[in-house]
Regions:
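Membrane-integrated ABC transporters
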Residues: 1-59, 74-93, 107-111, 115, ...
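Short intracellular "coupling" helices and adjacent cytoplasmic loop segments at the cytosolic face
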Residues: 14-22, 116, 124-148, 152-154, ...
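An intracellular "coupling" helix at the cytosolic face of ABC transporter transmembrane type-1 domains
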Residues: 40, 135-136, 154-161, 165, ...
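Transmembrane helices of ABC transporter permease
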Residues: 44-57, 68, 96, 163-217, ...
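Helix-loop-helix
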Residues: 75-77, 82, 181-195, 265-338, ...
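Hydrophobic alpha-helical transmembrane segments of ABC transporter permease domains
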Residues: 91, 103, 107, 115, ...
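Cytoplasmic juxtamembrane "membrane-exit" helices immediately C-terminal to transmembrane segments
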Residues: 109-117, 121, 184, 202-224, ...
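ABC-type nucleotide-binding domain
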Residues: 352-353, 359-604
Length: 604
Protein backbone atom coordinates (compact mmCIF):
# COMPACT_ATOMS: atom_id res chain seq x y z
CA UNK A 1 0.00 0.00 0.00
CA UNK A 2 2.75 2.33 -0.83
CA UNK A 3 2.30 5.56 -2.64
CA UNK A 4 5.09 5.93 -5.14
CA UNK A 5 6.19 9.45 -6.00
CA UNK A 6 6.21 10.48 -9.63
CA UNK A 7 9.57 11.59 -10.82
CA UNK A 8 10.01 15.26 -11.58
CA UNK A 9 10.66 16.26 -15.13
CA UNK A 10 8.94 16.04 -18.43
CA UNK A 11 6.05 14.07 -19.63
CA UNK A 12 6.28 10.34 -19.02
CA UNK A 13 8.02 8.57 -21.80
CA UNK A 14 9.35 11.73 -23.43
CA UNK A 15 12.95 10.66 -23.48
CA UNK A 16 14.38 13.06 -25.97
CA UNK A 17 15.22 12.67 -29.62
CA UNK A 18 13.24 10.08 -31.46
CA UNK A 19 16.23 8.05 -32.56
CA UNK A 20 15.69 4.36 -33.08
CA UNK A 21 19.00 3.49 -31.51
CA UNK A 22 22.70 3.92 -31.70
CA UNK A 23 25.74 1.75 -31.36
CA UNK A 24 27.11 0.99 -27.93
CA UNK A 25 29.50 3.65 -26.73
CA UNK A 26 32.13 1.02 -26.04
CA UNK A 27 31.22 -2.51 -27.12
CA UNK A 28 34.53 -4.06 -26.09
CA UNK A 29 34.71 -1.97 -22.95
CA UNK A 30 31.27 -3.10 -21.79
CA UNK A 31 32.12 -6.76 -22.34
CA UNK A 32 35.49 -6.19 -20.67
CA UNK A 33 33.80 -4.78 -17.58
CA UNK A 34 31.46 -7.75 -17.49
CA UNK A 35 34.38 -10.17 -17.75
CA UNK A 36 36.22 -8.37 -14.95
CA UNK A 37 33.08 -8.49 -12.85
CA UNK A 38 33.16 -12.29 -13.19
CA UNK A 39 36.76 -12.46 -11.92
CA UNK A 40 35.85 -14.22 -8.61
CA UNK A 41 34.36 -17.05 -10.67
CA UNK A 42 37.30 -17.49 -13.07
CA UNK A 43 38.39 -20.87 -11.58
CA UNK A 44 34.88 -22.31 -11.74
CA UNK A 45 34.29 -20.95 -15.24
CA UNK A 46 37.62 -22.45 -16.36
CA UNK A 47 36.53 -25.85 -15.02
CA UNK A 48 33.28 -25.56 -16.97
CA UNK A 49 35.14 -24.54 -20.12
CA UNK A 50 37.62 -27.41 -19.75
CA UNK A 51 34.73 -29.83 -19.31
CA UNK A 52 33.09 -28.45 -22.42
CA UNK A 53 36.36 -28.70 -24.35
CA UNK A 54 36.72 -32.34 -23.30
CA UNK A 55 33.23 -32.98 -24.63
CA UNK A 56 34.18 -31.33 -27.93
CA UNK A 57 37.25 -33.54 -28.27
CA UNK A 58 35.10 -36.62 -27.68
CA UNK A 59 32.73 -35.50 -30.43
CA UNK A 60 35.69 -35.00 -32.78
CA UNK A 61 36.93 -38.54 -32.09
CA UNK A 62 33.53 -40.04 -32.94
CA UNK A 63 33.60 -39.66 -36.75
CA UNK A 64 37.06 -41.24 -36.93
CA UNK A 65 35.85 -44.28 -35.00
CA UNK A 66 32.72 -44.55 -37.14
CA UNK A 67 34.95 -44.38 -40.22
CA UNK A 68 36.87 -47.39 -38.89
CA UNK A 69 33.62 -49.31 -38.37
CA UNK A 70 32.49 -48.43 -41.91
CA UNK A 71 35.78 -49.63 -43.41
CA UNK A 72 35.60 -52.89 -41.42
CA UNK A 73 32.06 -53.54 -42.65
CA UNK A 74 33.00 -52.61 -46.25
CA UNK A 75 36.03 -54.91 -46.15
CA UNK A 76 33.92 -57.72 -44.71
CA UNK A 77 31.44 -57.59 -47.57
CA UNK A 78 33.95 -59.61 -49.66
CA UNK A 79 34.63 -62.06 -46.86
CA UNK A 80 34.07 -62.27 -43.10
CA UNK A 81 33.24 -59.14 -41.02
CA UNK A 82 35.57 -58.63 -38.03
CA UNK A 83 32.82 -58.44 -35.37
CA UNK A 84 35.18 -58.42 -32.32
CA UNK A 85 36.95 -55.33 -33.69
CA UNK A 86 33.62 -53.64 -34.42
CA UNK A 87 32.32 -54.47 -30.91
CA UNK A 88 35.48 -53.05 -29.36
CA UNK A 89 35.11 -49.79 -31.28
CA UNK A 90 31.38 -49.58 -30.42
CA UNK A 91 32.09 -50.05 -26.70
CA UNK A 92 34.74 -47.34 -26.90
CA UNK A 93 32.24 -44.99 -28.59
CA UNK A 94 29.56 -45.69 -25.97
CA UNK A 95 31.99 -44.94 -23.14
CA UNK A 96 33.14 -41.75 -24.86
CA UNK A 97 29.58 -40.52 -25.48
CA UNK A 98 28.50 -41.28 -21.88
CA UNK A 99 31.49 -39.35 -20.57
CA UNK A 100 30.66 -36.52 -22.98
CA UNK A 101 27.05 -36.41 -21.73
CA UNK A 102 28.23 -36.25 -18.10
CA UNK A 103 30.66 -33.46 -18.95
CA UNK A 104 27.89 -31.55 -20.72
CA UNK A 105 25.62 -31.90 -17.68
CA UNK A 106 28.41 -30.75 -15.36
CA UNK A 107 29.14 -27.74 -17.54
CA UNK A 108 25.49 -26.71 -17.62
CA UNK A 109 25.15 -27.08 -13.85
CA UNK A 110 28.30 -25.09 -13.11
CA UNK A 111 27.35 -22.26 -15.47
CA UNK A 112 23.85 -22.10 -13.97
CA UNK A 113 25.35 -21.61 -10.50
CA UNK A 114 27.82 -19.02 -11.79
CA UNK A 115 25.10 -17.15 -13.67
CA UNK A 116 22.84 -16.93 -10.64
CA UNK A 117 25.69 -15.65 -8.47
CA UNK A 118 26.72 -13.08 -11.07
CA UNK A 119 23.11 -11.90 -11.38
CA UNK A 120 22.82 -11.63 -7.63
CA UNK A 121 26.09 -9.73 -7.44
CA UNK A 122 24.95 -7.24 -10.08
CA UNK A 123 21.61 -6.69 -8.37
CA UNK A 124 23.31 -6.31 -4.99
CA UNK A 125 25.68 -3.80 -6.55
CA UNK A 126 22.79 -1.81 -7.99
CA UNK A 127 20.91 -1.94 -4.68
CA UNK A 128 23.91 -0.63 -2.73
CA UNK A 129 24.65 1.90 -5.46
CA UNK A 130 21.19 3.41 -5.08
CA UNK A 131 22.01 4.41 -1.50
CA UNK A 132 25.17 6.22 -2.65
CA UNK A 133 23.66 8.19 -5.51
CA UNK A 134 22.68 11.84 -5.07
CA UNK A 135 19.06 12.92 -5.15
CA UNK A 136 19.71 14.75 -8.41
CA UNK A 137 20.26 11.41 -10.20
CA UNK A 138 16.75 10.20 -9.43
CA UNK A 139 15.25 13.51 -10.48
CA UNK A 140 16.72 13.02 -13.95
CA UNK A 141 16.14 9.24 -14.26
CA UNK A 142 12.78 7.50 -14.26
CA UNK A 143 12.02 4.80 -11.70
CA UNK A 144 11.06 2.41 -14.47
CA UNK A 145 14.42 2.85 -16.18
CA UNK A 146 16.26 1.94 -12.96
CA UNK A 147 13.98 -1.07 -12.47
CA UNK A 148 14.63 -2.16 -16.05
CA UNK A 149 18.37 -2.19 -15.37
CA UNK A 150 17.86 -4.28 -12.23
CA UNK A 151 15.57 -6.82 -13.91
CA UNK A 152 15.67 -6.96 -17.71
CA UNK A 153 19.28 -5.94 -18.28
CA UNK A 154 20.68 -8.18 -15.55
CA UNK A 155 18.58 -11.10 -16.82
CA UNK A 156 19.91 -10.53 -20.34
CA UNK A 157 23.47 -10.67 -19.03
CA UNK A 158 22.71 -13.85 -17.07
CA UNK A 159 21.17 -15.60 -20.06
CA UNK A 160 24.20 -14.77 -22.17
CA UNK A 161 26.60 -16.10 -19.56
CA UNK A 162 24.65 -19.32 -19.19
CA UNK A 163 23.87 -20.02 -22.82
CA UNK A 164 26.63 -18.38 -24.82
CA UNK A 165 29.91 -18.37 -22.88
CA UNK A 166 30.68 -22.09 -23.00
CA UNK A 167 28.96 -22.54 -26.36
CA UNK A 168 31.17 -19.80 -27.80
CA UNK A 169 34.33 -21.53 -26.56
CA UNK A 170 33.16 -24.98 -27.64
CA UNK A 171 32.08 -23.65 -31.05
CA UNK A 172 35.51 -22.15 -31.69
CA UNK A 173 37.19 -25.36 -30.52
CA UNK A 174 34.86 -27.51 -32.60
CA UNK A 175 35.45 -25.34 -35.65
CA UNK A 176 39.24 -25.48 -35.37
CA UNK A 177 39.26 -29.16 -34.37
CA UNK A 178 37.06 -30.21 -37.27
CA UNK A 179 39.27 -28.30 -39.71
CA UNK A 180 42.36 -30.05 -38.36
CA UNK A 181 40.69 -33.47 -38.53
CA UNK A 182 39.45 -32.87 -42.08
CA UNK A 183 42.83 -31.66 -43.31
CA UNK A 184 44.57 -34.64 -41.73
CA UNK A 185 42.07 -36.98 -43.40
CA UNK A 186 41.94 -35.56 -46.95
CA UNK A 187 42.94 -32.06 -47.95
CA UNK A 188 40.87 -31.94 -51.15
CA UNK A 189 37.60 -32.69 -49.37
CA UNK A 190 38.64 -30.40 -46.52
CA UNK A 191 39.12 -27.46 -48.89
CA UNK A 192 35.76 -28.23 -50.51
CA UNK A 193 34.01 -28.05 -47.13
CA UNK A 194 35.89 -24.94 -45.98
CA UNK A 195 35.44 -22.89 -49.17
CA UNK A 196 31.73 -23.71 -49.44
CA UNK A 197 31.23 -22.71 -45.79
CA UNK A 198 33.27 -19.51 -45.75
CA UNK A 199 30.50 -17.75 -47.65
CA UNK A 200 28.52 -17.68 -44.43
CA UNK A 201 31.15 -15.81 -42.49
CA UNK A 202 31.05 -12.67 -44.58
CA UNK A 203 27.28 -12.53 -44.46
CA UNK A 204 27.26 -13.18 -40.71
CA UNK A 205 29.77 -10.40 -40.01
CA UNK A 206 27.78 -7.99 -42.16
CA UNK A 207 24.57 -8.75 -40.29
CA UNK A 208 26.31 -8.40 -36.91
CA UNK A 209 27.70 -4.97 -37.77
CA UNK A 210 24.23 -3.72 -38.73
CA UNK A 211 22.24 -5.30 -35.92
CA UNK A 212 24.14 -4.07 -32.83
CA UNK A 213 22.50 -0.64 -32.86
CA UNK A 214 19.06 -2.24 -32.81
CA UNK A 215 19.90 -4.34 -29.76
CA UNK A 216 21.09 -1.21 -27.92
CA UNK A 217 17.93 0.65 -28.92
CA UNK A 218 15.72 -2.26 -27.80
CA UNK A 219 17.16 -2.18 -24.26
CA UNK A 220 16.76 1.59 -24.02
CA UNK A 221 13.19 1.65 -25.28
CA UNK A 222 12.37 -1.23 -22.93
CA UNK A 223 13.54 0.93 -20.03
CA UNK A 224 11.39 3.81 -21.25
CA UNK A 225 8.39 1.51 -21.63
CA UNK A 226 8.78 0.25 -18.05
CA UNK A 227 9.15 3.80 -16.78
CA UNK A 228 6.02 4.98 -18.58
CA UNK A 229 3.92 2.05 -17.36
CA UNK A 230 5.14 2.49 -13.78
CA UNK A 231 4.30 6.20 -13.78
CA UNK A 232 0.89 5.85 -15.40
CA UNK A 233 -0.06 2.98 -13.10
CA UNK A 234 0.84 4.85 -9.92
CA UNK A 235 -0.75 8.05 -11.20
CA UNK A 236 -3.82 6.41 -12.75
CA UNK A 237 -6.30 8.43 -10.70
CA UNK A 238 -4.65 11.71 -11.70
CA UNK A 239 -4.71 10.67 -15.36
CA UNK A 240 -8.43 9.94 -15.17
CA UNK A 241 -9.12 13.10 -13.18
CA UNK A 242 -7.61 15.29 -15.88
CA UNK A 243 -9.11 13.26 -18.71
CA UNK A 244 -5.65 12.49 -20.08
CA UNK A 245 -6.30 8.85 -20.92
CA UNK A 246 -6.07 9.45 -24.66
CA UNK A 247 -2.91 11.53 -24.31
CA UNK A 248 -1.22 8.89 -22.18
CA UNK A 249 -2.40 6.16 -24.53
CA UNK A 250 -0.81 8.03 -27.42
CA UNK A 251 2.43 8.36 -25.46
CA UNK A 252 2.32 4.64 -24.66
CA UNK A 253 1.60 3.77 -28.30
CA UNK A 254 4.56 5.89 -29.39
CA UNK A 255 6.99 4.19 -26.99
CA UNK A 256 5.49 0.76 -27.63
CA UNK A 257 5.78 1.36 -31.36
CA UNK A 258 9.44 2.27 -31.04
CA UNK A 259 9.97 -0.80 -28.88
CA UNK A 260 8.27 -2.98 -31.49
CA UNK A 261 10.24 -1.40 -34.32
CA UNK A 262 13.66 -1.87 -32.74
CA UNK A 263 12.75 -5.32 -31.40
CA UNK A 264 11.52 -6.41 -34.84
CA UNK A 265 14.67 -5.15 -36.54
CA UNK A 266 16.98 -6.81 -34.02
CA UNK A 267 15.09 -10.10 -34.17
CA UNK A 268 14.89 -9.93 -37.97
CA UNK A 269 18.65 -9.54 -38.18
CA UNK A 270 19.09 -12.30 -35.63
CA UNK A 271 16.64 -14.54 -37.46
CA UNK A 272 18.57 -14.23 -40.70
CA UNK A 273 21.61 -15.90 -39.22
CA UNK A 274 20.19 -19.34 -38.45
CA UNK A 275 18.57 -20.01 -41.88
CA UNK A 276 21.67 -18.66 -43.56
CA UNK A 277 23.94 -20.96 -41.60
CA UNK A 278 21.60 -23.88 -42.29
CA UNK A 279 21.77 -23.25 -46.02
CA UNK A 280 25.56 -22.95 -45.98
CA UNK A 281 25.82 -26.17 -43.99
CA UNK A 282 23.61 -28.10 -46.39
CA UNK A 283 25.44 -26.67 -49.39
CA UNK A 284 28.78 -27.81 -47.93
CA UNK A 285 27.27 -31.21 -47.15
CA UNK A 286 26.21 -31.71 -50.78
CA UNK A 287 29.56 -30.47 -52.10
CA UNK A 288 31.48 -32.91 -49.90
CA UNK A 289 29.27 -35.82 -50.97
CA UNK A 290 29.83 -35.08 -54.67
CA UNK A 291 33.60 -34.60 -54.37
CA UNK A 292 33.90 -37.60 -52.06
CA UNK A 293 32.06 -39.83 -54.52
CA UNK A 294 34.42 -38.81 -57.32
CA UNK A 295 37.49 -39.49 -55.15
CA UNK A 296 36.12 -42.85 -54.00
CA UNK A 297 35.44 -43.91 -57.59
CA UNK A 298 39.06 -43.04 -58.42
CA UNK A 299 40.26 -45.11 -55.48
CA UNK A 300 41.78 -42.09 -53.70
CA UNK A 301 39.78 -42.54 -50.49
CA UNK A 302 37.78 -45.29 -48.85
CA UNK A 303 34.04 -45.27 -48.28
CA UNK A 304 34.67 -44.81 -44.54
CA UNK A 305 36.38 -41.48 -45.21
CA UNK A 306 33.24 -40.22 -46.97
CA UNK A 307 31.10 -41.22 -43.98
CA UNK A 308 33.55 -39.54 -41.59
CA UNK A 309 33.60 -36.38 -43.72
CA UNK A 310 29.81 -36.18 -43.75
CA UNK A 311 29.95 -36.05 -39.97
CA UNK A 312 32.90 -33.64 -39.93
CA UNK A 313 31.06 -31.26 -42.23
CA UNK A 314 28.20 -31.19 -39.73
CA UNK A 315 30.68 -30.62 -36.92
CA UNK A 316 32.34 -27.90 -39.00
CA UNK A 317 29.17 -26.01 -39.95
CA UNK A 318 27.24 -26.37 -36.69
CA UNK A 319 29.70 -24.07 -34.85
CA UNK A 320 28.84 -21.40 -37.41
CA UNK A 321 25.24 -21.47 -36.19
CA UNK A 322 26.41 -21.48 -32.57
CA UNK A 323 28.77 -18.60 -33.26
CA UNK A 324 25.95 -16.68 -34.94
CA UNK A 325 23.64 -17.21 -31.96
CA UNK A 326 26.42 -16.44 -29.49
CA UNK A 327 27.24 -13.26 -31.41
CA UNK A 328 23.58 -12.22 -31.24
CA UNK A 329 23.48 -12.90 -27.50
CA UNK A 330 26.74 -11.04 -26.97
CA UNK A 331 25.28 -7.99 -28.68
CA UNK A 332 22.30 -8.06 -26.33
CA UNK A 333 24.62 -8.63 -23.37
CA UNK A 334 26.87 -5.75 -24.42
CA UNK A 335 23.90 -3.38 -24.66
CA UNK A 336 22.59 -4.57 -21.28
CA UNK A 337 26.03 -4.47 -19.63
CA UNK A 338 26.57 -0.95 -20.90
CA UNK A 339 23.39 0.21 -19.15
CA UNK A 340 24.10 -1.71 -15.94
CA UNK A 341 27.69 -0.49 -15.61
CA UNK A 342 26.64 3.01 -16.62
CA UNK A 343 24.45 2.95 -13.52
CA UNK A 344 27.11 1.32 -11.33
CA UNK A 345 29.67 3.91 -12.43
CA UNK A 346 27.39 6.93 -11.99
CA UNK A 347 28.88 9.71 -9.89
CA UNK A 348 28.29 9.05 -6.21
CA UNK A 349 27.91 11.37 -3.28
CA UNK A 350 31.27 12.40 -1.78
CA UNK A 351 32.87 9.97 0.68
CA UNK A 352 32.44 11.15 4.26
CA UNK A 353 34.19 8.35 6.13
CA UNK A 354 36.96 10.77 7.15
CA UNK A 355 34.56 13.06 9.01
CA UNK A 356 34.68 12.89 12.82
CA UNK A 357 31.91 11.20 14.77
CA UNK A 358 29.33 13.60 16.19
CA UNK A 359 27.76 13.60 19.60
CA UNK A 360 24.15 12.49 19.92
CA UNK A 361 23.31 15.41 22.24
CA UNK A 362 21.69 18.08 20.10
CA UNK A 363 20.28 21.42 21.24
CA UNK A 364 18.73 22.29 17.89
CA UNK A 365 20.37 25.60 17.05
CA UNK A 366 20.48 26.09 13.28
CA UNK A 367 22.25 28.90 11.43
CA UNK A 368 22.08 29.71 7.72
CA UNK A 369 24.95 31.97 6.72
CA UNK A 370 24.74 33.51 3.22
CA UNK A 371 23.58 30.25 1.67
CA UNK A 372 23.69 30.13 -2.12
CA UNK A 373 22.52 27.28 -4.34
CA UNK A 374 21.56 26.46 -7.91
CA UNK A 375 20.73 23.15 -9.59
CA UNK A 376 22.90 24.37 -12.46
CA UNK A 377 25.42 27.23 -12.51
CA UNK A 378 23.12 29.32 -14.70
CA UNK A 379 19.98 28.61 -12.66
CA UNK A 380 20.43 30.00 -9.15
CA UNK A 381 17.52 29.18 -6.83
CA UNK A 382 18.81 30.48 -3.49
CA UNK A 383 20.70 33.75 -3.81
CA UNK A 384 21.68 34.85 -0.28
CA UNK A 385 19.79 33.10 2.53
CA UNK A 386 20.77 33.97 6.10
CA UNK A 387 18.81 33.13 9.25
CA UNK A 388 19.45 32.04 12.85
CA UNK A 389 17.07 29.60 14.52
CA UNK A 390 17.15 29.14 18.29
CA UNK A 391 16.77 25.71 19.93
CA UNK A 392 13.13 24.65 20.20
CA UNK A 393 11.82 27.31 17.84
CA UNK A 394 9.07 26.54 15.37
CA UNK A 395 10.00 28.22 12.09
CA UNK A 396 7.56 28.40 9.20
CA UNK A 397 8.77 28.95 5.65
CA UNK A 398 6.13 30.31 3.27
CA UNK A 399 6.05 31.76 -0.19
CA UNK A 400 4.71 31.15 -3.68
CA UNK A 401 5.56 28.07 -5.70
CA UNK A 402 9.18 28.14 -6.83
CA UNK A 403 10.30 30.48 -4.06
CA UNK A 404 12.87 27.96 -2.79
CA UNK A 405 11.12 26.62 0.33
CA UNK A 406 11.62 22.91 -0.33
CA UNK A 407 15.09 23.59 -1.72
CA UNK A 408 16.14 25.06 1.64
CA UNK A 409 14.90 21.94 3.41
CA UNK A 410 16.83 19.75 0.95
CA UNK A 411 19.97 21.75 1.65
CA UNK A 412 19.42 21.43 5.38
CA UNK A 413 19.07 17.66 4.99
CA UNK A 414 22.30 17.64 2.95
CA UNK A 415 20.54 16.20 -0.09
CA UNK A 416 22.44 18.72 -2.25
CA UNK A 417 25.85 20.37 -1.81
CA UNK A 418 25.83 24.08 -1.09
CA UNK A 419 26.84 26.44 -3.86
CA UNK A 420 28.12 28.93 -1.32
CA UNK A 421 27.80 29.98 2.30
CA UNK A 422 27.37 27.65 5.24
CA UNK A 423 24.73 25.88 7.34
CA UNK A 424 25.58 25.08 10.97
CA UNK A 425 23.82 22.90 13.53
CA UNK A 426 24.84 23.71 17.11
CA UNK A 427 27.80 25.58 15.66
CA UNK A 428 29.05 22.61 13.61
CA UNK A 429 29.06 23.15 9.82
CA UNK A 430 27.14 20.59 7.78
CA UNK A 431 30.33 20.01 5.81
CA UNK A 432 31.83 18.50 8.98
CA UNK A 433 28.87 16.19 9.58
CA UNK A 434 28.07 12.96 7.76
CA UNK A 435 24.83 12.68 5.84
CA UNK A 436 23.75 9.78 8.05
CA UNK A 437 24.21 11.88 11.17
CA UNK A 438 22.29 14.82 9.70
CA UNK A 439 19.43 12.52 8.71
CA UNK A 440 19.34 11.07 12.24
CA UNK A 441 18.84 14.58 13.61
CA UNK A 442 15.60 15.17 11.72
CA UNK A 443 12.21 13.55 11.65
CA UNK A 444 10.18 14.28 8.54
CA UNK A 445 6.47 14.46 7.79
CA UNK A 446 5.82 15.06 4.11
CA UNK A 447 2.75 15.76 2.04
CA UNK A 448 3.36 12.53 0.12
CA UNK A 449 2.46 9.88 2.70
CA UNK A 450 4.82 6.99 2.11
CA UNK A 451 3.43 3.74 3.54
CA UNK A 452 4.67 0.33 2.47
CA UNK A 453 3.07 -3.09 2.37
CA UNK A 454 3.24 -4.59 5.83
CA UNK A 455 1.54 -4.24 9.17
CA UNK A 456 0.58 -1.00 10.86
CA UNK A 457 3.20 -1.81 13.49
CA UNK A 458 5.91 -2.16 10.84
CA UNK A 459 4.99 1.22 9.36
CA UNK A 460 4.82 3.04 12.68
CA UNK A 461 8.08 1.51 13.95
CA UNK A 462 9.93 1.88 10.66
CA UNK A 463 13.65 2.02 11.43
CA UNK A 464 13.08 1.53 15.17
CA UNK A 465 13.31 -1.63 17.23
CA UNK A 466 11.99 -2.56 20.65
CA UNK A 467 8.89 -0.33 20.55
CA UNK A 468 6.27 -1.66 22.99
CA UNK A 469 2.49 -1.61 22.59
CA UNK A 470 2.31 0.90 25.44
CA UNK A 471 4.50 3.31 23.50
CA UNK A 472 2.39 2.76 20.39
CA UNK A 473 -0.78 3.41 22.38
CA UNK A 474 0.65 6.66 23.70
CA UNK A 475 1.57 7.86 20.23
CA UNK A 476 -1.66 6.79 18.54
CA UNK A 477 -3.70 8.51 21.26
CA UNK A 478 -1.76 11.71 20.61
CA UNK A 479 -2.46 11.48 16.88
CA UNK A 480 -6.08 10.34 17.09
CA UNK A 481 -5.40 6.91 15.58
CA UNK A 482 -5.97 4.85 18.72
CA UNK A 483 -9.69 4.19 18.17
CA UNK A 484 -9.25 3.40 14.46
CA UNK A 485 -6.47 0.88 15.04
CA UNK A 486 -8.13 -0.87 17.98
CA UNK A 487 -11.34 -1.37 16.03
CA UNK A 488 -9.41 -3.48 13.53
CA UNK A 489 -9.40 -7.27 14.18
CA UNK A 490 -5.60 -7.53 14.25
CA UNK A 491 -4.90 -4.15 15.82
CA UNK A 492 -1.32 -3.05 15.21
CA UNK A 493 -0.66 -6.27 13.31
CA UNK A 494 -3.27 -5.45 10.66
CA UNK A 495 -1.71 -5.58 7.22
CA UNK A 496 -2.00 -2.50 5.06
CA UNK A 497 -3.53 -3.48 1.75
CA UNK A 498 -5.96 -2.21 -0.84
CA UNK A 499 -8.78 -3.71 1.23
CA UNK A 500 -7.99 -1.36 4.12
CA UNK A 501 -9.16 1.95 2.73
CA UNK A 502 -7.34 4.60 4.75
CA UNK A 503 -8.16 8.21 3.99
CA UNK A 504 -5.48 10.75 3.10
CA UNK A 505 -5.81 12.25 6.57
CA UNK A 506 -5.40 8.88 8.30
CA UNK A 507 -2.30 8.17 6.26
CA UNK A 508 -0.95 11.59 7.21
CA UNK A 509 -1.62 10.91 10.89
CA UNK A 510 0.28 7.64 10.58
CA UNK A 511 3.33 9.46 9.22
CA UNK A 512 3.11 11.91 12.14
CA UNK A 513 2.88 9.00 14.57
CA UNK A 514 5.91 7.46 12.90
CA UNK A 515 7.83 10.71 13.40
CA UNK A 516 6.81 10.74 17.08
CA UNK A 517 8.17 7.22 17.54
CA UNK A 518 11.39 8.21 15.78
CA UNK A 519 11.77 10.96 18.41
CA UNK A 520 14.36 12.94 16.45
CA UNK A 521 15.60 16.17 18.08
CA UNK A 522 14.48 18.30 15.11
CA UNK A 523 11.60 18.15 12.65
CA UNK A 524 10.74 19.04 9.07
CA UNK A 525 7.07 19.26 8.15
CA UNK A 526 6.59 19.78 4.43
CA UNK A 527 3.04 20.88 3.52
CA UNK A 528 1.67 18.13 5.76
CA UNK A 529 -1.93 19.40 5.77
CA UNK A 530 -2.41 20.69 2.24
CA UNK A 531 -4.37 17.69 0.93
CA UNK A 532 -6.97 17.09 3.66
CA UNK A 533 -10.29 18.59 4.71
CA UNK A 534 -10.63 21.23 7.42
CA UNK A 535 -11.75 18.84 10.19
CA UNK A 536 -8.92 16.42 9.49
CA UNK A 537 -6.57 19.38 9.25
CA UNK A 538 -7.47 20.29 12.83
CA UNK A 539 -6.68 16.76 14.02
CA UNK A 540 -3.39 16.80 12.15
CA UNK A 541 -2.58 20.27 13.45
CA UNK A 542 -3.12 19.13 17.04
CA UNK A 543 -0.87 16.13 16.46
CA UNK A 544 1.75 18.35 14.87
CA UNK A 545 1.66 20.76 17.80
CA UNK A 546 2.29 17.84 20.13
CA UNK A 547 5.06 16.58 17.88
CA UNK A 548 6.86 19.94 17.58
CA UNK A 549 6.69 20.83 21.27
CA UNK A 550 10.22 21.42 22.54
CA UNK A 551 11.81 20.59 19.17
CA UNK A 552 13.38 22.84 16.58
CA UNK A 553 10.93 22.57 13.71
CA UNK A 554 10.80 23.78 10.13
CA UNK A 555 7.31 23.91 8.65
CA UNK A 556 6.52 24.46 4.98
CA UNK A 557 2.85 25.19 4.40
CA UNK A 558 0.56 26.78 1.83
CA UNK A 559 -2.29 27.08 4.33
CA UNK A 560 -1.10 30.04 6.36
CA UNK A 561 -3.79 29.44 8.98
CA UNK A 562 -1.82 26.40 10.19
CA UNK A 563 1.29 28.39 11.15
CA UNK A 564 -0.20 31.19 13.24
CA UNK A 565 1.53 29.85 16.34
CA UNK A 566 4.97 29.64 14.71
CA UNK A 567 7.75 31.40 16.64
CA UNK A 568 9.08 32.83 13.40
CA UNK A 569 7.76 32.99 9.85
CA UNK A 570 10.17 33.39 6.96
CA UNK A 571 8.59 34.71 3.77
CA UNK A 572 10.56 33.68 0.68
CA UNK A 573 10.36 34.94 -2.86
CA UNK A 574 12.73 34.18 -5.73
CA UNK A 575 15.19 32.47 -3.36
CA UNK A 576 15.48 35.34 -0.86
CA UNK A 577 13.87 36.17 2.50
CA UNK A 578 11.77 39.26 1.94
CA UNK A 579 9.97 39.30 5.30
CA UNK A 580 10.50 37.78 8.73
CA UNK A 581 8.57 37.83 12.00
CA UNK A 582 5.59 36.36 13.83
CA UNK A 583 2.14 36.04 12.30
CA UNK A 584 0.86 39.21 14.00
CA UNK A 585 3.97 41.21 13.15
CA UNK A 586 3.79 40.30 9.49
CA UNK A 587 0.09 41.14 9.28
CA UNK A 588 0.76 44.54 10.82
CA UNK A 589 3.45 45.24 8.22
CA UNK A 590 0.87 44.79 5.49
CA UNK A 591 3.46 43.35 3.12
CA UNK A 592 3.63 40.29 0.92
CA UNK A 593 2.71 37.87 3.73
CA UNK A 594 -0.39 39.89 4.56
CA UNK A 595 -1.40 39.78 0.89
CA UNK A 596 -0.99 35.99 0.82
CA UNK A 597 -2.92 35.55 4.05
CA UNK A 598 -5.79 37.83 3.07
CA UNK A 599 -6.04 36.31 -0.41
CA UNK A 600 -6.54 32.84 1.10
CA UNK A 601 -9.42 34.05 3.25
CA UNK A 602 -10.95 35.93 0.33
CA UNK A 603 -10.87 32.71 -1.69
CA UNK A 604 -12.43 30.83 1.23
Amino acid sequence: MSETKRRPGGHPGMRGPDVPGEKAKDFRGSLGKLIRHCKPFYPVICIAILGDLAGVIIRLIGPNKISEITNLITAGLRGEIDMPAIQKICITLIILYVVGALLSFMTGLVMTVVTQKVNRGLRDGISHKINRLPVSYFQSTSTGDVLSRVTNDVDTIGQTLQNSLTSLVSAVTMFIGSVVMMLSTNWIMALTAIVSSMLGFGLMLGIMSRSQKYFVARQRWLGDLNGHIEEIYTGHNVVRLFGAEQREQQAFDRINGKMQETDWKSQFMSGLMMPLMGFIGNFAYVAVCVVGAVLAMNGTISFGVIVAFMMYVRLFTSPLSQLAQAATNLQSAAAAAERVFEFLEAKEMPDESHLPAQTKTVRGEVAFDHVRFGYTPDKIIIHDFSEHVQPGQKVAIVGPTGAGKTTMVNLLMKFYPLGGGEIRIDGVPLSQMTREHVHDLFGMVLQDTWLFEGSIRDNLCYGKEGITDEQLDQVTRATGLYHLIHTLPEGYDTLLSDKLNLSAGQKQLMTIARAMIENAPMLILDEATSSVDTRTEMLIQQAMDTLTKGRTSFVIAHRLSTIKNADKILVMRHGDIIESGTHEELLQKGGFYAELYNSQFEQA
